[in-house]
Amino acid sequence: MTVTAAALAALPASLLAIWALRKTPAARYVVAAPRADRWHTRSTPLLGGSGIFAGMLVAAGIAVATHVIPASRELGGILGGCGILFLAGLVDDVYRLPPLAKLAAQGGAAALVIWSGVRVQIISNNIAATALAVVWLLGMTNAFNLLDNMDGLAASLATIGCAFFAIDAFTIHPDTMIALLALAVCFGCLGFLPYNLRLRRPASVFMGDSGSQVLGFALGSLGLASSWTVAGSTVATLVLPLLVLAVPILDTSLVTIVRLLEGRPVTQGGRDHTSHRLVYEGLSDKRAVVLLSGVSAALGLTSLAYKVLDDTRITLLGVLITFAFLLQFGSYLADVNRPAASDRAPSFLASLLVHRRRLVEVVVDFLLISASFT
């Protein structure tokens, strides 16, 4: 049996698990009800995360049982961390966990992965490397939690991201465990998408926190294990996870900065994400998802090209130009007027919004000038 064949088992496992769960009483009680600060307009079961995680476990179990991959400590750490967040997310979907409890679960999952041996090797100082790994894992976990704000968005971006991690693990930096996990998450998401991204109807199932946190943590772990543990140029090792996951990073940064500037709590829900702003600009929900997925795929292809090229100067220049473009894109979206925007008087920080575009242009010029001297 091959890695791909073992991982492919995640697809029917996810499909069947979600189908079966929809027939249970949980489909009526574990639901996301419509709210003023949420995008959906009808109560929807929060069962998708169970299917995605079930697919991951089935694929990994088959791969280990058939000796496609060994039962390694790293594999156990990543799956164990995902398991912690799946359970915490499931409790949150049913009872609503306080933010500190969710953060504690995320910290425990990150500690388990780091204990298993997945570390940042591009930094020699162990304390700094551990701190960076924790920040990265928690950041990606919460980024996907925030990104799960429109039908099909989080699962589509996770599918694309995992596909590029798998390509890297099959070709550039061969690693069967990373390839298996990336494909397992990818196929698990593909089993979920028929329920969540339907052509002419709204989603019949959401992934919930039990799905979004698992996806974010899994992708963060894959980023650490597949790239940041590889010796070599710092730029080359950073390029894949940073570009493949640039859209979630952009969305989280945009939401955080704008809410702080407007004097609103960062943890408060809202209809002010990247996807929502694209809809306010005239796109349909599905076209917004397709556009962001296309951007993610283009960035993934770019990252692979840089890794194959293996030229630090060209890669650095390309990455700086890419992030300069993303800064401009984020600045443009931040200026989009929201129908339900707050009527409160602007805070001192909010007054800076008037000059945001000029500030971004200065930053972009600085990045490009700096890159020209590398």
Give the ranges of each region predicted by the language model.
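Signature of alpha-helical transmembrane segments in polytopic membrane proteins
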Residues: A5-A6, G318-T374
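Mobile late-domain/C-terminal helix-loop "cap" segments
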Residues: L243, P265-V308
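Cytosolic, membrane-interface loops and tails of multi-pass inner-membrane proteins
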Residues: W19-P45, R201-P202, L254-L283, R338-L352
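Hydrophobic alpha-helical transmembrane segments and immediately flanking/interface helices
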Residues: H67-G83, T252-S253, S303-F329
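Alpha-helical membrane-protein architecture signal
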Residues: W136-G139, R271, S275, R356
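Select subsegments of transmembrane alpha-helices in polytopic membrane proteins
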Residues: S43-A54, A154-A155, S210-Q213, S284-G294, ...
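Alpha-helical transmembrane segments and their membrane-interface junctions
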Residues: L57-A63, L292-K307, F366-T374
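"…together with the soluble PPM/PP2C metallo-phosphatase catalytic core" -> "…together
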Residues: M1-T252
